[in-house]
Regions:
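Extracellular/surface-associated beta-sandwich interaction domains
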Residues: 1-178
Length: 178
């Protein structure tokens, strides 16, 4: 994001399009030009609500954006009452592909925000994305390790303690590149 805080996109409805949907193994396993496969190390869970052993339909969130201006961003939000202090880390597999072969690694980034609001009480973690080549079929190529978000929550505590020990203004965003 170009500025910290809650993001309100400018009115460019004619230029940038943004769609949120889902993709799944059952309906998109033969998708072209890149088929949908499970991320490395992930197995489909069994549906324990039936008497027959059946695998659940594993799926992922799709954020599809076209004509995004440099420095602009789009996001999907989920509000939740989950207390993250009960967990040690958050892990997310990220895949990036272009409509055509005109994207390069690092042209886009993925960010995740965790916090109580989107203006002053949040942590944000961002990584540049590697683009998957058309025709890729291996899970390791479709879900490259460089695109994996794996955040130990203790890093947020460490950064907050660092900010406080440096006597930084707690009312201004504190940025740490790791």
């Amino acid at each position: 994001l170009s500025e910290p805080g809650e993001y309100v996109p400018v009115d460019d409805q004619e230029e940038t399009s943004f769609d949120v949907s889902s993709i799944n193994i059952e309906e998109n396993g033969n998708r072209s030009p890149i088929n949908y496969v499970l991320p490395p190390g992930i197995e489909q869970e069994l549906d324990n609500t039936t008497t027959t052993q059946r695998q659940q339909n594993e799926q992922s969130l799709v954020l599809k954006v076209c004509n995004l201006k440099d420095g602009d961003s789009r996001a999907a939000y989920k509000r939740s009452d989950i207390d993250m202090r009960n967990y040690k880390r958050i892990k997310m597999f990220v895949h990036a592909e272009g409509k055509e072969d005109n994207l390069k690694n690092g042209d886009f980034s993925c960010f995740i925000r965790l916090g109580t609001d989107f203006s002053s009480n949040y942590y944000e973690y961002e990584i540049p994305l590697d683009i998957t080549d058309f025709g890729s079929t291996r899970a390791e190529d479709i879900w490259p390790q460089e695109n994996e978000i794996d955040i130990p929550f203790e890093i947020f505590q460490d950064i907050k303690q660092e900010r406080n020990s440096n006597s930084e203004n707690v009312f201004l965003p504190y940025v740490k590149y790791v």
